[in-house]
Every structure is written in structure tokens, then in C-alpha cells.
């Protein structure tokens, strides 16, 4: 079993008025050379939580942190015009909270952060995307 001490929340950086399925996400990651989706979990706009990668395997979502983290991504993050925005639906907010609380229970002492907290240099154009923190979930 891997040592986990970090839960990293991402957005898919897709427009909130468009559908971006777990299949779309996986296909995009395969095109980028990954072996599959880089995130362990994906939360759709309707709140469905999709398991994309076994927790026993490191993710491909936060360079330098993958070996000790779990990647959670929610669908959206951009408004209808493509501008960064907190587009989480009430369903996504609920599912994200439940999932994170379960993960924190399974991996006590883990820290919760947004992807922007680990690689702000890579997210300059999306710096204002709201990736939830522990305080906004609990």
C-alpha cells in the first residue's frame, strides 16, 4: 500500500456549459501520453463520483507529488466564456465533501490542497480557478 499524505483537488478546466465525461478526460490524457486518466476520482456535474485509477497506483496529476497523493478532479472550472470560475454545482460540492471526508478518514493526517498550491507556475492563466480547500469543504 502506498503512503498517502496529500489529497489534491483539480478542476478539468472545461466550460461549465459543456459536457466533459470521464471518457473524454481519459481520452485527453491518453493523447498526452499518459497510460490513462491521471486522476483517481472524477466528479461529474450531476455529482456522480467516477473512479478512474486504483488508489494503489500513483496518479499523474501533480508532478513531484504523485507518489504520495490522491488526485480528485471535478468537471468544469471555466464559465460559459472560458474564464476561470468556481462552477461547482451543489451536487459536486456535496460529492466532493463526502469523498474528501472519506479519504481523510482512510488517510488520517493527510493534507488537502488545490493543484494551484503545488504548481502555481503552471497555472498562471487559471490562477483564479477556485479549487476547494479543507476550510471550504468542512
For the regions a language model picked out, list residue spans one by one.
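Active-site-adjacent loop/helix surface patches within enzyme catalytic domains
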Residues: 2-111
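Histidine-centered divalent metal-coordination motifs
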Residues: 10-11, 115, 128
Amino acid at each position: 500500500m502506498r503512503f498517502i499524505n496529500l489529497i489534491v483537488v483539480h478542476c478539468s478546466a472545461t466550460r461549465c456549459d459543456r459536457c466533459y465525461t470521464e471518457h473524454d478526460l481519459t481520452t485527453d490524457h491518453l493523447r498526452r501520453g499518459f497510460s490513462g486518466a491521471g486522476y483517481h476520482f472524477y466528479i461529474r456535474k450531476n455529482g456522480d463520483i467516477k473512479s478512474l485509477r486504483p488508489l494503489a497506483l500513483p496518479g499523474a496529476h501533480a508532478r513531484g507529488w504523485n507518489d504520495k497523493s490522491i488526485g480528485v478532479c471535478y468537471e468544469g472550472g471555466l464559465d460559459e466564456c472560458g474564464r476561470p470560475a468556481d462552477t461547482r454545482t451543489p451536487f459536486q460540492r456535496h460529492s466532493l465533501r463526502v469523498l474528501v471526508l472519506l479519504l481523510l478518514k482512510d488517510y488520517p493526517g493527510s493534507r488537502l490542497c488545490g493543484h494551484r498550491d503545488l504548481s502555481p507556475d503552471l497555472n498562471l492563466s487559471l490562477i483564479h480557478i477556485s479549487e476547494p480547500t479543507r476550510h471550504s469543504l468542512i
